[in-house]
């Protein structure tokens, strides 16, 4: 891939100074900053410190930030805090797969002549564009080569000068190298053949253009007695199936080719051929199916339960579905042979067991039901079929004259199926059988085909099956070009002849014919001897096959003209297994595609002259000699070949035996690496045991070039390891079942910290970060896509003398690595950052590699051009198109979509309950406006001071008691858990809670649905009493996860998943203990409900709506289905706002002076020295040379009316405002500086500008850490001139930060958070109703004040109603997963609560 061509050179250059570089992706290097921004004497001073006696964040509770919610948790009187962990509450959920959508492709149809221009581009321009890296790209990628017409040129391109005999232009090479193929024969159901190869017909340079591109899917029959033989459809079929001339299309049907699965496509009947075409687009990064299965061990008959995910060509399984980066193992379906249900052990019962066979072993699985087992088998069969298919489309073609007979073969009640038997060719006498199923017009098709066969038989009565019979010129050409390849489930074997002739063949009883693109051929396979069956007994891993394994692949095409039906049943490629790889070209494939045998290509032109070779043998003979050999071989092929199965191994051993004495060690290494037992013991690494172990423990690092060899300036490599043929990249890809397009870039030895330090090896490739444990007895593997990595940070190690590296991942807990030396750690960090920058902006099309994207485009173009030709025929001949309803109807099986309309039929009365500041109310106004538009009747219940604002938007209002300003004053002025805080809060707070609960109960009457911020505390109990569905909504993380810490417990440094999870457990328990007494008394006296506990409430089962962007806080992998991150709920009040004239003039003047503009506003905060903070802001703005719009709100006491006044005069660079809508203001500035509240952060990020956050309390620390992790801003721990001026300069000059912020802003603006939230409400409404009913049945009493309480209780089961300890429990699997996560979190962090309360986490951990 082009972006990585110079990675090796850049990496070497940068690695030399790695230890001196800054590692933050969002910050500029110190060397880039001007000298004036170096730290001064005030670098450690914080001018935002609160007044004396209150203390700073460091002086008080370091983690429980100053907020109303923390205050609530702190002042519950007579609460037994020592017992806060005696009661537990479960959190569970399952992982939802994320898919990437495939972007539409149109560029391949851009030329005026789609046929010729595309042909020339693929053969000429793309050939020159490919790097030499493609020469070594073998294995899996060529299997995916699809209809991009690469058959017009050799797939292997080179930047080296061409030999004199090679045509200099792409057109000449096209004409000389590629003689035409007339037609193709097809399959028969034989046992195992190695793999399916593509053969796509070449395009003639004189072929007329097809014109426009059309997308149509039509599935019935077309009859045309007037159709011209040169119609667009005839021409297109001639090009695709390589006929001699355009053949008149007699009829067209929508049908399915029946093999292990129904392959839906089209049958075209021409004058001389029957053709079948199917388009099979693939998306390799989409999870096809996932779920729980039981897997049997290799030796242990016991079944163990795992979470399985089928993605691309790999079936992976995981012990924990929330840890999808750490697979327990995988089954590589590229080596798959079959997937089938096991035989039922009981008569009359369908089996739940099934098995998957590969070329190495058979895997046994058990599903939870027989239906599930069938679904898995069907999905696996599709994947195995795709891996056998050489691209994104399948073609089958055979001459009508070769048809023996056609007979009906009833298989399905709803379709007509018949079998066509075809003689493969005139030499082999092989007979193939094809089954075609017609869902419409089947009887008509059968009659027509039988009549054609009968007419052909009567017209050619002299035709025989004898290979010695007279044949027409076309027949002769067909004979010479048909069986150019024989493929086997084993490997290629040399033919019978001297080594000088370079004759290689692959042994098989089955033939797959390549199209004209598949240039390498094996001429000695024209005739097959019965002794060839001996060759089939060679296993892939044996010496005879491994020695002569050749991985030169031929030119590829996008689709296949298949020969013989057994191609559907053999493995695509064969395991690298315990043998030395030849080099990168070996991949894990056998001759010809794995199985492509490589040597010389014998192509016969029409006049019988030998064609030009496409690929050299291993020795690479010159043109002239190869031509001579080809000519000789072409002469030999007129008679039967004489394969010698014993010769290959003997010749190889003789050759090895003639090595000089100094090469004896190499021969011994050759034998040693082929020992299966030793290879298993040494983890398939082909190096000596002593060297392996010593190198492993010494550690270090290695970088690899384009050919995946160690760069010369890296650490010395063992000479024997160099001479050993096995490529480093091959072993890397074999370890993790990765495609051949994944190139190894660097490796490091390090410790992965999870529960215990685990020593292993880090692999960095173009798109993956992988880890493999090296400790005996451990099998930990990690595969992490770099696109999921947000940032990389250097930290101190957990152990003395070690250096730490933290990987921050989207929606997942952080990963910690430890290195022995700082050099290795710094080098790894720099390498990762280089790859992150490359990967971050690569277009994600849903495909694994750029080659696959090109190939998919070409296959799609071929499909569209064929559809276009059909439409052209319709226009010319007035033939009705295929009936849309005649063929197979697609089955709706997309788990991410739904055909069900979840919107309630009637209008709902929806109440939104919240408390707090203006920022807590604003999102609900936006949501209620959306609900009004949907026809519902929303109401907001909050503090009375917000009533005018709410009613101005046409939303109903209900008051809730409590003064938010007084609560905020207690939090801000007293700090957290100080003596003055506890004293004042205990005096005022308890009465406030009683008033809040009672007023909330009154405000929520007459509601059908309740949506509440969990800070309001009353909603879940009110919904239980009213028997109505209940949702939660909030602006910060409140649900348990290992990905992020609780918003009120953000640590100074990353602490990992165990810490993150335990913060939620702690806060839930402490918060509930503080209010439990008052809440239960209120439930009994006013709601008529029984007392409850945290476990009985099951708050983690409640549907939750988070109103921030999934691009800012990606959904964690361990969130259950009912927790949804919807996007911001913006109100957009600035649309009609008119700015003051002086503000507009200030902005205009700054633009004219070419100065950057920043906004600075921290809200209403309390600081010890307001004038010092003002001077700091002024000096920082002047030092950074920017213009500032200032919104001042700080003072030495909360609510001070003079807080907006400046203590010192403001310079002309600063313009002060009182208020302005954020959505308007942030669009006018280049950067924003604020306190980091959820709403303000969302507004600045939506504007697409870098954001600087100075957090003070609450969730502000969480959002500060998020913008820094995303690389779109800076979070300042202290505020002084040195730090602030540098941050202002970076935010306005760092192109990396500016681009990232701009891209993030575009993503946020594309979201519609309100609409997504409303759809989520509809979707989860039934789930919420179920929860409400279950809770009300369990907790209602005869004194319940709600009219429906008794009736509902009577409907419930008496046992459940009377149960005091009833607890709603969901799916067992869910609960098991929750329990495992909780147990792991608690065991991982036994002492963490004490550390949390003693301010010593960082010191104890590092």
Curated annotation (Swiss-Prot):
Residues 468-478, 576-587, 1376-1387 have a biased composition (Basic and acidic residues). PROSITE patterns: PH_DOMAIN. It holds the Pfam family PH. It comes from the Eukaryota. It comes from Aspergillus clavatus (strain ATCC 1007 / CBS 513.65 / DSM 816 / NCTC 3887 / NRRL 1 / QM 1276 / 107). It is a peripheral membrane protein. Residues 110-128, 490-499, 531-548, 1397-1406 have a biased composition (Polar residues). Residues 83-231, 457-558, 576-622, 1334-1406 are annotated as: Disordered. It is found in: Cytoplasm; Preautophagosomal structure membrane. One of its GO terms (cellular component) is phagophore assembly site membrane. It is an enzyme of class 2 (transferase). The keyword Cytoplasm applies. Residues 209-231, 1336-1349 have a biased composition (Low complexity). This is Sterol 3-beta-glucosyltransferase.
